[in-house]
Every structure is written in structure tokens, then in C-alpha cells.
UniProtKB/Swiss-Prot annotation:
GO terms for biological process: queuosine biosynthetic process; tRNA modification. Belongs to the GTP cyclohydrolase I family. QueF type 1 subfamily. Pfam families: QueF. It is found in: Cytoplasm. This is NADPH-dependent 7-cyano-7-deazaguanine reductase. It comes from Geobacillus thermodenitrificans (strain NG80-2). PANTHER family: NADPH-DEPENDENT 7-CYANO-7-DEAZAGUANINE REDUCTASE. Keywords: Cytoplasm, NADP, Oxidoreductase, Queuosine biosynthesis. Catalyzes the NADPH-dependent reduction of 7-cyano-7-deazaguanine (preQ0) to 7-aminomethyl-7-deazaguanine (preQ1). One of its GO terms (cellular component) is cytoplasm. GO terms for molecular function: preQ1 synthase activity. Substrate binds at V78, E79, S80, H97, E98.
């Protein structure tokens, strides 16, 4: 199998760009995608994003998290540098943890149209409580819809020991 051709990569404007600018304002338009060369196969792509930050919508204090994104692509995959810059754009975005993971998932669904996706935020404690929102989605009317229901019901059967992360 040959590598990707320049023509296939022409829409990726952020990867390899040495003049990267970081947006401090939430911007879903930063997300870029490329063609999945293996649409005939189910496989997971997982991103571990340990440097996510956003702001509490009330106090404007910073919140920190590791965001885990797993998806089964269909025709498109998200490009990782664009994902990094997109997640960075939450830096000054004021929203609750639950909102952030759902916004991330919705934006990725809009740009990729995956077969299945899940987003799990593991936020560091504030006030002695850590919050770990989880959301997922499977394409309606397919086996992925059933998969989403099953994974939601079973996503945290073996909770981790919390030691302030």
C-alpha cells in the first residue's frame, strides 16, 4: 500500500504549519478531517488528551481534565493537530464539565460522521469532588446504536481509585 498523496492532504491546513496560532476562543471550525482509507473495517481510534482546560461558567476559575475520545470512523477521521488546537480553544470557554464533553462529542460527530464515538472527561477535583462525565453516540438504526447503549450502561463497572489524579 502506498502512502498518502499531497492531493489527499490539501485540506489539512494546520498539520506541518510552523506558524501555528492558538485560539483562546472556542472554535469548532478548527477541526479538520481526512479520508479514512479503511472504511470497510471497524476499528477504534483513541485520543488521550491530558492537558484540557476550560473555565467554570460561574466563578471563571480554571478546570483541568484528561479527555479521552474514542471513535469508530466511517469515511472521515479527525486530524490530531487540529483536534489539539480545537481542544485548546476551550481554554477561556466557560461551561460545566458535562457540557464540555457533550460539545466535544457533538462537534466531532458534525465534522466526521463516525459510526460510533465516546468522550470521557476526567476532571481534577475542585472542592474535594472530581467529576467524570461520559457521553457516547452510535449511528441510529445500526449496530452502533446498540453498542452505544451497551457501553453507556457498562462504562464504569470498575471505577478507578481516585488519588487526586
Amino acid at each position: 500500500m502506498n502512502g498518502r498523496k499531497d492531493e489527499e492532504l490539501k485540506d489539512l491546513t494546520l498539520l506541518g504549519n510552523q506558524g501555528t496560532t492558538y485560539s483562546f476562543t472556542y472554535d469548532p471550525n478548527l477541526l479538520e478531517v481526512f479520508d479514512n482509507k479503511h472504511p470497510d473495517r471497524d476499528y477504534f481510534v483513541k485520543f488521550n488528551c491530558p492537558e484540557f482546560t476550560s473555565l467554570c461558567p460561574k466563578t471563571r476559575q480554571p478546570d483541568f481534565a484528561t479527555i479521552y475520545i474514542s471513535y469508530i470512523p466511517d469515511k472521515k477521521c479527525v486530524e490530531s493537530k487540529s483536534l489539539k488546537l480545537y481542544l485548546f480553544s476551550f481554554r477561556n470557554h466557560g461551561d460545566f464539565h458535562e457540557d464540555c464533553v457533550n460539545i466535544i462529542m457533538n462537534d466531532l460527530i458534525n465534522v466526521m460522521e463516525p459510526r460510533y464515538i465516546e468522550v470521557w472527561g476526567k476532571f481534577t477535583p475542585r472542592g474535594g469532588i472530581s467529576i467524570d462525565p461520559y457521553c457516547n453516540w452510535g449511528r441510529p438504526g445500526t449496530k452502533y446504536e446498540k453498542m452505544a447503549e451497551y457501553r453507556l450502561l457498562n462504562h464504569d463497572l470498575y471505577p478507578e481509585k481516585i488519588d487526586n489524579r
